């Protein structure tokens, strides 16, 4: 049964993504960052809804009393899967995700990343890349956006 549910999710995820895929690049090309972020949140909400209904995955937020949405902050997270990246798009209204530049090489997905409101870093750049990331993060926080960073980088097991 798990295989059937997984395949059903894969098919519906593909259909949902195809239905949404014209909107995000169009808004990005029109340079409408607010609407682009709203479209991304709509898409991630649909993906999380499918994963809940079909796979039984639930998003449970703990410590909400410590969440202060009136001011931007930095979220530091251990990267377990793609799921938490999607979840943060729902939990935090205006989040800027720090991601590795190599993801831009993935066909189609890379184009979306390049036009999404994200901070892309070259991990081979050492201190120069760190300085650029900090500079961009400061700029985004000044704009009122929170930052999500996975300091371990690629998925960790901690």
Which residues fall in each region the model found?
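Soluble catalytic domains of membrane acyltransferases
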Residues: 54-158
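A transmembrane-helix-recognition feature enriched in membrane-embedded lipid enzymes
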Residues: 1-60, 111-112, 116
């Amino acid at each position: 049964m798990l295989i059937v549910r997984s395949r059903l999710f894969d098919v519906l995820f593909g259909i949902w993504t195809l239905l949404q895929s014209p909107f995000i690049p169009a808004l990005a090309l029109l340079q409408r960052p607010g609407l682009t972020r709203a479209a991304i949140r709509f898409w991630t909400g649909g993906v999380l809804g499918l994963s809940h209904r079909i796979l039984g995955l639930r998003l449970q937020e703990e410590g909400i009393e410590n969440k202060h949405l009136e001011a931007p902050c930095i979220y530091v997270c251990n990267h377990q899967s793609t799921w938490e990246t999607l979840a943060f798009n729902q939990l935090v209204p205006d989040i800027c995700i720090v991601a590795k530049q190599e993801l831009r090489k993935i066909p189609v997905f890379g184009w979306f990343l390049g036009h999404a409101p994200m901070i892309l870093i070259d991990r081979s750049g050492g201190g120069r890349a760190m300085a650029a990331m900090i500079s961009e993060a400061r700029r985004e926080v000044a704009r009122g956006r929170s930052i999500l960073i996975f300091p371990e980088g690629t998925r960790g097991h901690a």
